[in-house]
């Protein structure tokens, strides 16, 4: 069975605008096109679309996705190179997670400060500088992450 872009949008939840953009970038070179220029997606194409959507959500560049797709098309001889691409993206995303954890910890610290100040009825205070907050929390978060890493390794 084949599907038009609008049908794929309904089926996948991915906007037709995104799909068309990715089509224009060459991420779907093997789509069937009828005499009127209407492109049709197979189930396999929809599966690839879902992977593209995930890779984009993870921050992978279109260029890297194109390269990855080209490697996939070449078959098993490119497995190691594809593995390296996936591992590199995973490493980037794990680094982003650590940065987000630090940022969330800073927000929680500020939140707790405001809760304490408002519960005591204080309206004037001297907040810690951003740098000071970050240094304190970086140390705490890094210790927490190291503890979690040690648990995972056991």
Enumerate the predicted regions with their spans.
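Long, amphipathic alpha-helical segments that form or neighbor coiled-coils/leucine zippers used
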Residues: 67-70, 74, 80, 84-86
């Amino acid at each position: 069975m084949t599907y038009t872009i609008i049908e794929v949008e309904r089926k996948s939840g991915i906007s037709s605008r995104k799909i068309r953009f990715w089509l224009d970038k060459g991420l779907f070179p093997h789509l069937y096109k009828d005499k009127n220029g209407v492109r049709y997606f197979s189930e396999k194409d929809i599966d690839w679309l879902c992977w593209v959507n995930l890779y984009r959500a993870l921050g992978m560049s279109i260029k890297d996705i194109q390269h990855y797709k080209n490697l996939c098309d070449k078959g098993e001889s490119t497995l190691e190179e594809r593995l390296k691409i996936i591992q590199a993206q995973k490493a980037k995303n794990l680094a982003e997670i650590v940065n987000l954890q630090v940022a969330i910890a800073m927000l929680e610290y500020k939140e707790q400060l405001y809760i304490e100040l408002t519960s005591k009825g204080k309206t004037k205070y001297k907040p810690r500088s951003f740098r000071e907050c970050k240094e304190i929390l970086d140390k705490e978060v890094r210790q927490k992450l190291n503890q979690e890493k040690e648990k995972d390794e056991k």
